[in-house]
Amino acid sequence: LNPIFLFKNKEQKQKFADDVISGMLEWHSVTNDKFGSLSNPIYDSWYDYYKEEKQKPWLAALKELSNNGKFSKKKLQLLIEATELFNNLPEENTKPVLIHADLNIMNIMADTKTLKLTAFIDPCGSIWADKEYDLFQLRNMWGDAYGLYETYKSNSEMSEFTDFRVAYYASMHEAAMRLKGGLIMPLWEDLNNARLKREMKKLKEKM
């Protein structure tokens, strides 16, 4: 989605957000018995999937990078502290749903004149996951300018821990881009980490 769409009016942006979230809710209504890859999901628990496939290997590799001076020790410590909080949260009643897994604003197409949604693209990383894992990309780059994340939350039942978990997923994913040869955007990483710190503070106040 071109940044020029930021200049569309409020009504157009909200209609766009409503259409995007309607599409997301449709594929989130497709469920499965287990979490994991589309072709071979093997995990009974979302936390088990995330810890084994993402959290543990990512943190181990980031620690190695940090020891070699290629990843900030301060950023690593933030992720370690956030991980401890994440792992101590109840998993709640999560169920495996179909997610896009990379639905940031650049993977959404719209008509240049009307901002009418025309397509979702690049669903190459789709998996069976907790629906919350599809939400952090909605806030990536300038997604918040369209209210995508808040629109989703207003149209679906969410957990009291959603904001923290989504912030955690975002910071972990951004840090892990170093391990995949992906493009590192320091601005987005700093914004994600700042949001994570705020959500950690809120969560600690609840506990």
Name the predicted role of every residue range.
Residues Q12-F16, K95, T162:
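Conserved acidic
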Residues D19, L78, D144:
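Charged catalytic carboxylate motif
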Residues W27, I80-L135:
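Active-site acidic catalytic loop and adjacent metal/ATP-binding pocket
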Residues G125, F136-M207:
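Helix-rich C-terminal or lid/interface subdomains of diverse kinases
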Residues N40-N88:
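Active-site catalytic-loop/activation-segment of kinase and kinase-like phosphoryl-transfer enzymes
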Residues H28-S39, E64-N68, P90-K95, M158:
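Surface-exposed helix-capping loop/turn segments at secondary-structure junctions
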Residues L1-K10, N32, L59-E64, M172-L187:
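A glycine-centered beta->alpha junction motif in the catalytic cores
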